[in-house]
From Swiss-Prot:
PANTHER family associated with the record: CYTOCHROME B
Record field: transmembrane: 33-53, 77-98, 113-133, 178-198, 226-246, 288-308, 320-340, 347-367
UniProt-recorded name of the protein: Cytochrome b
Binding annotation for heme b b562: H83, H182
Disulfide bonds: none
Amino-acid positions noted as binding a ubiquinone in the UniProt annotation, renumbered to this chain: H201
Main localisation: mitochondrion
Length: 379
């Protein structure tokens, strides 16, 4: 009798993707983050759904509806903080996943990589519009400042901003449409993630050595299902610890003050996961230049496969490239710190130097050092 798992049209797809999938035998825990991102997405959609049942996307009631969720809804505070801190966990996994791709040369699967960059942009958009919904001070001013960046676009900028706002300032129309975007985008992310997976399974996974592993594959289940479950337990434990012991650790106290267009907060800043890009934006004293640098800081990922000059795919056996990679990580952490600081000396100059180093490392140093490594290996 044929196994239904391998013959039924629906289970066959699942079987080929998660059970009998041939997987390299040597992939490390850095390969866990893909499944953890899937778990984060499911958790965010579920908690978000329950929050949407009680939230009202109207300027006069949005803030109080969030307070109502936290005070009056059964376990509403728990759902709300799971959702808020779940976003932080999502970005931690996302950045680790991208870092893994950069280190081990996974970007050489170009379709998978490009869909991944598109996914990153979509997740960032979702997080941004979601941050506006509680309608606190930082929600309102964050929305005002970031949407205003589009006014730097020559000729059509101002019209574009007013079109997005649905008026002459961030108001009711803006909040309503941002709620609509925040509701629909996760489903678009889910569809893109399926395409991401589809392209990945066309080529099979990369592995830490960067050498083709066709001759040494093992089935995904049970070897990697059990490994993914362990990763999931760590993720859930961290999320629960954060949610139950320090729910506001990563948030901004200003967002507990209702939005007031007449009072600007002393320091307008986004959530921690956008601070590196915000620091790059602020480091350029020209508005259009800042916006372009902000865009390029993310879109530079698309050009990574074109900047590959090494004859080896992975950085596993390339100590000089490893040094530059960890310098890049340190630089990003510096930018994240700078993004949360006020615009004054010495933070301005540190931010500018860190921004220059970020682009210089990716566009110049890493490709050059890769060529030197080729020479040293007589390739």
């Amino acid at each position: 009798m044929t196994n239904i798992r391998k013959t039924h049209p629906l289970t066959k797809i699942l079987n080929n993707a998660f059970i009998d999938l041939p997987t390299p035998s040597n992939i490390s825990s850095w390969w866990n983050f893909g499944s953890l991102l899937g778990l984060c997405l499911i958790m965010q959609i579920l908690t978000g759904l329950f929050l949407a049942m009680h939230y009202t996307p109207d300027t006069s009631t949005a803030f109080s509806s969030v307070a109502h969720i936290c005070r009056d809804v059964n376990y509403g505070w728990f759902i709300r903080y799971l959702h808020a801190n779940g976003a932080s966990m999502f970005f931690i996994c996302l950045y680790a996943h991208i870092g893994r791709g950069l280190y081990y040369g996974s970007y050489m699967f170009q379709e998978t990589w490009n869909i991944g960059v598109l996914l990153l942009l979509t997740v960032m958009a979702t997080a941004f519009v979601g941050y506006v919904l509680p309608w606190g001070q930082m929600s309102f001013w964050g929305a005002t400042v970031i949407t205003n960046l589009l006014s730097a676009i020559p000729y059509i900028g101002t019209t574009l901003v007013e079109w997005i706002w649905g008026g002459f300032s961030v108001d009711k129309a803006t909040l309503t449409r941002f709620f609509a975007f925040h509701f629909i985008l996760p489903f678009i992310i889910t569809a893109l993630a399926a395409v991401h997976l589809l392209f990945l399974h066309e080529t099979g996974s990369n592995n830490p050595t960067g050498i083709p592993s066709n001759m040494d594959m093992i089935p995904f289940h049970p070897y990697y299902t059990i490994k993914d479950i362990l990763g999931a337990l760590f993720l859930i434990l961290t999320l629960l610890a954060l949610t139950l012991f320090a729910p506001d650790l990563l948030g901004d106290p200003d967002n507990y003050t209702p939005a007031n267009p007449l009072s600007t907060p002393a320091h307008i800043k986004p959530e921690w996961y956008f601070l590196f890009a915000y620091a790059i934006l602020r480091s350029i004293p020209n508005k259009l230049g800042g916006v372009l640098a902000l865009l390029l800081s993310i879109l530079i990922l698309i050009f990574i496969p074109m900047l590959q000059t090494s004859k080896q795919r992975s950085m596993m056996f390339r100590p000089f490239s490893q040094l530059l990679f960890w310098t890049l990580i340190a630089d990003l952490l510096t930018l994240t710190w700078i993004g949360g600081q006020p615009v004054e000396h010495p933070y301005i100059i540190v931010g500018q130097l860190a921004s220059i180093l970020y682009f210089f490392l990716i566009l110049v140093l890493m490709p050059t050092v890769s060529l030197i490594e080729n020479k040293l290996l007589k390739w």
